Amino acid sequence: MELETSVYRPNAAVYDSPDGVEVRGRYDQVFAKILTREALGFVAELQRDVSLGMLRYAWSAVERQNVVTTFVLSLGLTLPLSSSEIGEWVCSVCSPPAVADRRVEITGPVERKMIINALNSGAKVFMADFEDALSPSWENLMKGQVNLKDAVDGTITFHDKARNKVYKLNDQVAKLFVRPRGWHLPEAHILIDGEPAIGCLVDFGLYFFHNYSKFRQTQGSGYGPFFYLPKMEHSREAKIWNSVFERAEKMAGIERGSIRATVLIETLPAVFQMNEILYELRDHSVGLNCGRWDYIFSYVKTFQAHPDRLLPDRVLVGMGQHFMRSYSDLLIRTCHKRGVHAWEGMAAQIAIRDDPKANDMALDLVKKDKLRQVRAGHDGTWAAHPGLIPICMDAFGHMGKNPNQIKSMKRDDASAITEEDLLQIPRGVRTLDGLRLNTRVGIQYLAAWLTGSGSVPLYNLTDEDAATAEISRVQNWQWIRYGVELKRRTGLEVRVSKELFGRVVEEEMERIEKEVGKERSLREECIRKLARCLQSSVTAAELDDFLTLAVYDHIVAHYPINVSRL
């Protein structure tokens, strides 16, 4: 697949970088204020320290998949770090007062207008996302760093020329958390000692270096910065993050425990290691969050070779399913036992401005979901759109004057949850419509991701990001592999095959071209290339670990190697 890239000009300026660091992304004077010699040196030191530790746990995707599946299915869940499970220890008792109340959080990519609107939204927290909601192109990542620095400085503005409107921050804004990429994604535009930088350390390191001092003054009340950590599979990863935090605190000369982080529990292995993860991060933790969409993706990926564990249509895999409810309840109990917040994730429905009936349906779904969450004992929730914040805030108003439910909802009843509860096979039908929806979402999301957008409003009134696109991909792959019988609208069944899927792809491409081809400036040939890319992934003999990793090279735009110094 060929995508348009920037043209290199021989007389272009280059970044000033320290020994061992090469910056191969496009030069920009504004970016250069972020990519200073000192900031790049800081990132390089973090990577050199971390690389030594990560080498001990390095394993191929195939090896990891085999170990994870065996680990989960064996139910041999006794772990070596026994002190993390037993005893009455709690995470740091000096919890930052700035984040005692996090009942509603809004999430979104690190785009300039989004940052302003989210900070002004009335939510308690804004999670600025370098991960699933962002396509990690060089331009997006560097503009995101610039935007966050301006936000922390309080100087961020945005001029919407079409509306002739200037956006700026209110006096009262949400607390800022930043989510870096997962460990699996590299940053190919920066080389450290000849190897691609680790994406999450670039995101974390540049943001921390430029903002820790100002953030602690204006946002953190002496603490911070604050982070969300995604895609963890094992407490070893939490231990590595803890060492990164301690190294950063030491280099900055701030107190140990200043940095605080919430971990997303969004993989099947991690749900069995929540105590261990909190224990490793006990001086830096402020809670765990149910990353429900990635969790479903992880369930399918973990059991990819087990035809007895096929999921129904993804729209049917909600928190009402026993294995999902068990996961959420156990997370609440674990967090409250250890003195930190528990969240359940996204209300992905978005406001529908031009369809009052559809809008009412979406808002009703959100209201019911949020009331269920607060009654279960969660301390807060996520919203994908500012229009949903009043509904979420009203639901969590049931907590009364208390900023959280850590002491009032211990959920000791969840101690009875077993491994079988967490692995119970979900119920529901598998349909041809489900296969079609997965295919449409996959093609359209991939098109958006490769052209710079990471979060896209698509079908079912939802905001799709990488997590839901990944569910669609792996579910189609599994259904094809095992020739699953799918129900048609007529009630008859049809067996999935590569040939059937090929016909579905062609039909859904035609539908997409009619619906959004011209509107979103997606050329017909571009759509067809993307569809072929997805079709190849879904029908491959082996399942790719992450679709975004498999297609990452298509958004990399390298410039000549001699860009390391002025």
From Swiss-Prot:
Motif Microbody targeting signal — list its residue ranges: 564-566
Sorted alphabetically, the keyword list is: Glyoxylate bypass, Glyoxysome, Peroxisome, Transferase, Tricarboxylic acid cycle
Name of the protein this chain belongs to: Malate synthase, glyoxysomal
Claim: Transferase is one of the keywords in the record: yes
Instruction: Quote the CDD domains the UniProt record gives.
Output: malate_synt_A
Q: What is its main location?
A: other
Task: Give the EC number.
Answer: 2.3.3.9
Q: Does the keyword Hydrolase apply?
A: no
Tell me which Gene Ontology terms the entry assigns under biological process.
glyoxylate cycle; tricarboxylic acid cycle
Q: In which pathway does it act?
A: Carbohydrate metabolism; glyoxylate cycle; (S)-malate from isocitrate: step 2/2
Q: Where is the catalytic site?
A: 179 (proton acceptor), 465 (proton donor)
Q: Where in the cell is it found?
A: Glyoxysome
The EC category is transferase
Q: Which family does it belong to?
A: Belongs to the malate synthase family.
Quote a single Gene Ontology cellular component term: glyoxysome
Catalyzed reactions: glyoxylate + acetyl-CoA + H2O = (S)-malate + CoA + H(+)
User: What's one GO MF term for it?
Assistant: malate synthase activity
